[in-house]
Every structure is written in structure tokens, then in C-alpha cells.
């Protein structure tokens, strides 16, 4: 594993810290290491939730390493499994990822956060997609994911002028889940992770699968699709041991013991 990436396992929760002073910028080598970490997380049955954060208090990630670019790394270089930053092109991840944004999330750093399922950010965090000012475009998900979250006028301003969005504005638009003090950031992310661990893993996998499959469908069509039998996790969860355990635990006034089957 890259020395720029620190992995910590806390039971079923994996913490990934990007630590590349001064700005946690990501070159191809680092992106490959991040992809390996996220794919291992995906495939490890003991892990339930991942938290991705940046080292230090100023930068979550400044995105693509422009020093590497100046030395010849192309914008369309091979950034490894999972695409840029290891997560932006993993489309079959059935476990939740939390981005704990500790500072500036610019360019590919913002795109990395957008690829997560939840964003918890510090009060000093801000978000921007400045690629157009560098002669490129935010094609690691920014130009695709942001329009699903914001009105066109706001998206256009952000992607065409590179203007920054504060943590509080991001909260108002619903891009982030929580804004907390810098000192509370990781505790808040871990609290959310534990809440996710308390939910049944098969149910979460089914939810993510349904979101992916039906997000562009009308509601009626979505109903038909999820009941068509083509999905993997949704039919499984309906007939799982966990589907019996949940109501049983509720009736017995105890915490459920999920088996993931």
C-alpha cells in the first residue's frame, strides 16, 4: 500500500486517510493505491462501511496532482481500478462510503466526495470544480454527478467559472449531510458509520442496487423493474435470515444480530 495512504480498521469500519502534503493531491500512483483500498473494502465480508478523509486540517484533496501533470502525466492517464481517486468509477459498490471532508475539496477532490454516499464536512470545508480554468473538464464524475444534485444555473457557475461553495451553502443545497467543527469531524463520521453498521447489510446493498437501477426511471416503471426478478440483492433480502431477525429482535426488545444472509 502507498505511503500516502493510511488504512485503519475499527471492527467493520475502514478508515482511509489520504496523506500527501501539502494539498493531498492525487497522482496516478496514489489513485491506483486508493482503487486497491476501495476494491479490497468492497470484497471484504468483514467490512461494512468506509470513511475517506484527508490528512491535516486544510485540504481534503486538491484533486489531480498538477506537479505530476507538469511532469507529463496526462489528464486521461490510467488512474487504475475505480477510476480517479479509486472510487469515482466503482459502480457496483454495495457498501456505504462516507467522505469526511476536513478542508478544501477541489477538482478531483470534490469528485471523490461526490462519489461517496454521505458527506460530513468541517465548517472550514469548501468545494470547487476549477478544471475549466486549467483548460480541462471535471470528467471524473463532477460534470455527471453535480447536475443531479443542483439546479442548472448553480452547476453552470461552478463548472464554468470554478466558483467555490462553502460548507454551509453545500448543506443548504443538500450536497452534504452534516457540518461540524473540525475537532468533531471524525467523531461525527464514525457516529454515522456506526448507525449504518446498525442497519442490515443486505438491506443496504439492496437499497444501493435499487438506486442505481431506477434513478432515471419514472416511479411506476421503477416498481415494475424491482419486481421483475432481475435484481440480485432485492429478492435475496426479502427471503433472508436477516429479514426474520429484524422483526424478531424488535418483538423481543433487543438489538438485532445481522448475519448478512
UniProtKB/Swiss-Prot annotation:
GO terms for molecular function: hydro-lyase activity; L-carnitine CoA-transferase activity. It comes from the Bacteria. Keywords: Lyase. The keyword Lyase applies. InterPro entries: Carnitinyl_CoA_dehydratase, ClpP/crotonase-like_dom_sf, Enoyl-CoA_hyd/isom_CS, Enoyl-CoA_hydra/iso, Enoyl-CoA_hydra_C. Belongs to the enoyl-CoA hydratase/isomerase family. This is Carnitinyl-CoA dehydratase. It comes from Salmonella paratyphi A (strain AKU_12601).
